[in-house]
Every structure is written in C-alpha cells, then in structure tokens.
Amino acid sequence: MSSEVKQLIVVAEGTAALGPYWQTIVSDYLEKIIRSFCGSELNGERNPVSTVELSLVIFNSHGSYCACLVQRSGWTRDVDIFLHWLSSIQFGGGGFNEVATAEGLAEALMMFSPPSGQAQPSNDLKRHCILITASNPHILPTPVYRPRLQNVERNENGDAQAESRLSDAETVASYFAKCSVSLSVVCPKQLPTIRALYNAGKPNQQSADLSIDTAKNTFYLVLISENFVEACAALSHSATNLPQTQSPVKVDRATVAPSIPVTGQPPAPVSSANGPIQNRQPVSVGPVPTATVKVEPSTVTSMAPVPSFPHIPAVARPATQAIPSIQTSSASPVSQDMVSNAENAPDIKPVVVSGMTPPLRTGPPGGANVNLLNNLSQVRQVMSSAALAGAASSVGQSAVAMHMSNMISTGMATSLPPSQTVFSTGQQGITSMAGSGALMGSAQTGQSPGPNNAFSPQTTSNVASNLGVSQPMQGMNQGSHSGAMMQGGISMNQNMMSGLGQGNVSSGTGGMMPTPGVGQQAQSGIQQLGGSNSSAPNMQLSQPSSGAMQTSQSKYVKVWEGNLSGQRQGQPVLITRLEGYRSASASDSLAANWPPTMQIVRLISQDHMNNKQYVGKADFLVFRAMSQHGFLGQLQDKKLCAVIQLPSQTLLLSVSDKACRLIGMLFPGDMVVFKPQIPNQQQQQQQQLHQQQQQQQQIQQQQQQQQHLQQQQMPQLQQQQQQHQQQQQQQHQLSQLQHHQQQQQQQQQQQQQHQLTQLQHHHQQQQQASPLNQMQQQTSPLNQMQQQTSPLNQMQQQQQPQQMVMGGQAFAQAPGRSQQGGGGGQPNMPGAGFMG
C-alpha cells in the first residue's frame, strides 16, 4: 500500500490581539487536533502508512505596526517540533486597522501541493487548514496569489491567469473548497466576519455545522469542517456528547499549564455518590494564572438521558494545605483542566437538566481567584466564603447543574434579582438566597431518594468533587457567607472551589467589575486574598473580618455605554466598546450629556494622571472594555493615557493592570489646569522665604507689643521728663543765684578795700596833721570794717560746703535757696547788731 501524505497548515494571527488567548487555543484545540491528526487513532486503530506534514503561517496587520505582513515556516513531520513552534510565537504589534487574513490564507493555499487530476471524496480530504484569528479581516481587496485551477479563466492568448489579483479574505476562503482543502476556524470572539469566512470555505453550504465542545470557552467561535475527520473526532472525544437541545455549561477559560511528569503520591480515593471511581494516575500540575467568572443562571427542561462521563476525572483534596495532586484519567491529558483566564472572563451558563440519572464526575478545576475592584484606591476585597461554580445536584430522578449566583459578575446584571434567583426541577429546589446572617452549620435536608453521604465537617473543610451532600456545606469557617444555601443531595460538579480553611488564594491578574444592584457580593466585611497560583481545586479563604454576612449595595453605578474610537489618517476607527461606571457617591448627572462615541483627540504621558496636581475637583470613573484590543495594550506598555474631549468635560483615560479595565479622571470644562510642580531647591528657597516672612512677622509683632507697652508707659515717662526738666530748671536757678552772690561778694570786697584804702590814706593825713586822739578816733571805723568783713568770710565758708552738697542734693535744698534768692537783698549777718 502506498503511503498517503496528509498536510495540515495552521494560519495564525500574530498581533497582540490574539496573544492572551493563544495558550488556551493551543492546549484545548490545536494540540488535540494535531495529535489526533498525526496518530489517526480512529476507532481505536492506528494507520501506520500515512505520512503527515505540518506547517505554520503567521500573518499580521497592514501598516507600520508590524514589521512583516506574512511569515511561513517549512514542513515538518515531528509533532513535538511543530508544537514547539506554536508555543514560541511572539505576539505583538497591531493597531486600529484589520489584519491581513486574506494574505495569510492565500499563502497557505499556495503552500499546499497542487491537487491531482482525480477528484477526492469530500469526506476524505487529505489537506486541511485551521485559521486562528482574533481580529476582523481587512475589508478591502488586496493583491494576493491564488492557485491555478483546471477550469480557470483564460486570457486572450489562452494562458491560465496565475498572476496576482485583488481579493478579500472571503474570496480567498472560497478557493479552499475548489482546491479540495478543508477550512476550519478558531476565534476567541464571536465575530460574524470569521463565521462568513468559514461558510465561504465550506464545500457544501447546506450542511449543518457539527457540535463542537465549547464548554470551557463560552465565547469562542470554533467551527471545524466536517471534512476534517480527525479534528472532529479529537474534539468530540473530549466533549460531553450532549444532545443538541442541551447547552453545556459555558465557562470562559484561558491559559492552561502544560503537562508535567507524574510526581508525588496519589491521594486516597474518594467514593462517589453514584458509584466507585476508577483508578487513575496522579498528575502534578504547575502554577496556573486564575481569575473569577461571572455566573448567569438559565434553565433548560425536558432533557434526554445522557451517558456517563468517564473521560472527566474526579478531584480529591488531601487534608493538608500543601499543593495537592489531581486525579485524572490517562485518556485525558492534564491540558484539559479547566482554568480561568483573567483577561477574558465571560458568563457561565448553568443549566438545569431533568430526567437524567447517570453519575456525574468533575474535571479538575484550576485555582480560583476572586479579586474585586471595589474602589479607585485599588482596595481589593474578595468573598470570604466558598464560591461554587459548577456543582451538580442529584434530586430524585434529575441531575441539576447548579452555579452559585453570588459569584462576582463582570458588570452585567443577572437575569433574576439576587434574592429571587431560584433553580427548580419540579421536585426539589436549590435556592440562592441573599442571606443576611452567618451560614449555619446545619439546614434543612432535602428529600432525595438518591444515595446521601453525610458531609462531615473537617478542619480544612475539604470538599471532594464526587461526594453526595445531604447538608448545606457544613464546616465552613466562621464569617460572612455570600453564597447560596443548598438543599437536597448534591453531587459536586465542575469547578468546585472548596477548602474554606485558614489560607489564602492567589490574587491573579484579573479583577471583576462589581455588578450594580447585586446584593450577594457582600463587598463589606471581607478581606483580600493572597497566596499561590495553583491548578488544584483548593480555595483557601482568609478569615473574615466579621462573623455575620453584611449585604451592601454596589459601590459603582453604570452611567454610560458606548464606543471608544481613535483616528487614523483623519478617519475615526473603532477601538472597542466601553461600559462606564461611576462611584455611588458621585453626581447622577455626571454623564448626562456624553455622546455614544468617545473620540480620542490625543495621547499624553500617564504621569499626568499619577504625579500631577490639578486645580479643581476631579471625578474618578471605571471603564470596562467589552473586547481586548492591541491599542489598549500599547497604552499600557508605553504608559500613555488618552485625552477625550466631552461636551462639557475632559476625560483622561488610562489602562490599569487589570485586563479590560480602564481608569478615567473626569474634569469639568474643556481644559485641565495643572498646579506647577516646584523643584526641591525652589521648594527649599520658598520654605526659607516663608520662614523669613514668619520671622519678620514675629519681629513686627514684638515691635507692636513694645509700642503698645510704650503707649501704656507714656504717662510715667512724661512725668519723669517733667521732673527732670524741673530739676534742670532748679539747678539753673541755683547756678544763677550762686553767680549773683559771688558778684555781690566781690563788689562788697572791692567797696570795703576801697574804703580801707581811703581810711588809711585819711588816717595818714590825720597823723600828719592832727594829734594822736584824732588818729584813735579814726581807727575805730577801721575796726568796725574788719568786724563787718568777718561775717562775710563766715558766709563764704558756709556757701562752699553748701555748693558741694547742692551737686548731689540740689532738689532737696532748692526750695530753701530759691527763697533766699527770692529775697533779693543782702543776707542777714549775725554780726550786724554788734556793729551798732
């Protein structure tokens, strides 16, 4: 038998828009398809004669954002090498425009070997192509090469036209059916343009699409060609084989840890409520990034019976808080583990299925992170109770897939009010209550004819996935319980987050927007979680801050929903759709006049939002991007913020560390005024000047106080000055009196001397002319004069000590002297009477 050559080309988008979803796509879809395609394990048989060739094509976007438009690899037959190529793709670039999907598909068509002349059966094609993209294709036709066909159009000379032609992506996709190549698509978003590409590449437009397992990734668009038998078998083998009338539980998942060699000891097997569990190999799983998921209830009735799920492994948790082992079957690789993606956390679609009795088993969920952005100061609060996302309840003859309605949502309201969300099957009900009290250790036990295993509380509150629970979650740590009380026999299904001990849960990269009006969130009285990223289903919650549940209204209110657009070459380009939330304390008319589309006018550095001081009041808002875009990643990488001019406000928009989360600062008016930033030296100088001014003010105050004191002391000073002036006047009068007395004394002495000289001269004449008697008579006046001079000498002697005393005691003796001076006459001499 001749060897058959089978070819598979993976055409992947290389921009940053696909980067967050790539690991999920590789682990959940591509790896399964490739291994099934290379092994050909159809119906348990292996076909050794087939030869497999694998290749990779990477396309980017038009413009200057990407260095290369299309890249291709060679052909390889080694599966591991090809998987290594897939895991080594570096995503980056992109922009506002669409991607070059047409060029990538055309390159893949040209790489395939030309079709042989013999027509191949449509259900047994050997050449396949898988398109992986997260962006819309370029809408304008571009020059691409297309392969030659037997019935191609010919020119005037009759030669086949194989030159470059203008074609869009849908036109190129239509050539796949003509070239006997199956076209399948995997898109992490529900894009209508990608579905149109798949429909254009279908050989039979009337054929119905096959049901593909999208339970893990709710919003993923996975369309596998019916002619790609190996891919359909690989994905249907891991699916639940549910009827088309039943919607599987939809959980958006992302990055999955690669398989790791078997290590550690397997935990003790746990008996199931519906039968024993087969022996499975314990597998240790590496750290996985996690995130929270929104729960939205829905009800489906009248479901047909379904077979059991032997491929979904059970989860057992050891009593210790170390990283546990996960039991999984050998037929299901570890990459099938369900983990949450922090960057894309859409709705969980729970269903209520009646009329089914087969045993249900759960797959090993990843660690759950409940990271809630409650306010703009980045205060993170999380639920302080168990968050169950996917438990199944066996009630009589029905199996109920139950989801806790108290999970933190992504910003969309639930279908029922929080206090009225009820899951019912007609016989038993599982009621989600917005309770206001602490979870009690016991509750009403539902009447269930099925097997009920007592749920015994443990110190670590271990919950096995396959335990039949007849009591509502005993053994929880004391604290706020934001979950629902479950009644009836419950068999835990997918994504059970157990382990309510004293531990921590890793705070991953994604936080969920609080849903307005949902009371079960219990945003008050709960603490932040922190811990280790683990793919184990253990969820250890920190001790709550209060012993009773506290219900509170949401701190954010949705005020706006619209489009965010930019400009490219003067034309507006849609970036993403936004939802705006304001604080509950902000004004109701904050976004009253906002337009449906916000236009970015320019980009500025993010430092303006973090380090600047603004004049006036700024309101903070939180925005949620409905879809991820490469432009938002560039804003975060380059630390830029967008300036949006609103009718009467200015909005500065920056991307936060959380996926699809944007922070806005809203300013009134059409411009933002910054306070000038002053360098340190100038600040020091200003401080010095301020100190100097303070010192001057203190000095002025002191001077004012002194002046005030002086004003108070002025009367005393004036009195002292008057007294001093009086003293000076008295001293002056005394000096004048002394001078006058001296003059009088001198005059008297001169007169006396003159009289003496006259008397002496007259006496001499008398001696010469008269006898001795006359001379004696004449001497008597002389004696009399001498006697008169003696009192005068006495007065001079008395005045000298008085002048000395007056130098120090002039004030005391001044009145007496003034009376003496006021007499004006000669002093009374005690010797005057003696002369008479």
Curated annotation (Swiss-Prot):
Pfam families: Med25_VWA (PF11265). Residues 271-282, 442-466 have a biased composition (Polar residues). InterPro entries: Mediator_Med25_VWA. It comes from the Eukaryota. Residues 731-818, 827-836 have a biased composition (Low complexity). Belongs to the Mediator complex subunit 25 family. Component of the Mediator complex. Interacts with the transcription factors BBX20, RAP2-2, ERF1B, ERF091, ERF095, ERF098, ERF109, HB29, PHL1, DREB2A, ABI5 and MYC2. Interacts with the E3 ubiquitin-protein ligases MBR1 and MBR2. This is Mediator of RNA polymerase II transcription subunit 25.
